[in-house]
Regions:
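Short active-site loop/helix that positions an aromatic residue
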Residues: 77-89
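Compact, glycine-rich, soluble single-domain proteins
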Residues: 64-65, 72-77
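Long, compositionally biased stretches
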Residues: 2-68, 95-159
């Protein structure tokens, strides 16, 4: 099996079931067209989008519904065509498509979610886009408050 190098996970197998393709790349990362969507039970519901060509490029994301349960996903006809979605129906988030908010962790510890430009993935063919909304309803810096780590999962100091 082919392996890819990553900054945070070392070498990992290239699992085609986790592969997400961005036909046009991501804004500012147009050459990055293939990512692994890595989920781990310890960090659920967090999703890591790891580039398969650039080891140091890994985006953190959360399902939009985890950030804003009332989020209204809009997908244009052009975006539907790129994703390979039916042009006549509007898929709600988390059914035909997965909608993810990219997460930013600032040096000062602030954490925010980009609700203005969600990553939208067609679950059937694993094609994805970053859909930019210009309607002003959502921010690219929606503040997040991280829950405290559960007491039973905190690592104990060595004795």
């Amino acid at each position: 099996m082919v392996e890819i190098k990553t900054k945070y996970f070392g070498s990992i197998p290239l699992d085609s079931g986790l592969l997400v393709e961005f036909p046009s790349g991501l804004p500012a990362f147009e050459r990055e067209q293939a990512f692994l969507a890595i989920e781990h039970p310890r960090t659920a519901p967090l999703v890591m989008l790891q580039s398969i060509t650039t080891p140091d490029l890994c985006f953190l994301a959360l399902p939009i519904s985890e950030v804003d349960p009332d989020y209204q996903l809009l997908i244009s006809a052009e975006e539907r065509a790129v994703l390979g979605l039916d042009q006549t129906t509007d898929p709600p988030a988390n059914t035909d498509v997965a909608a993810l908010a990219l997460i930013a962790v600032r040096q000062d510890g602030r954490v925010s979610a980009n609700l203005m430009s969600p990553v939208v993935v067609n679950r059937a063919n694993r094609r994805a886009i970053q859909s930019v909304r210009w309607d002003g309803l959502y921010s690219h810096e929606h503040p997040l408050r991280l829950p405290p780590a559960p007491a039973d999962t905190q690592e104990q100091p060595c004795s």
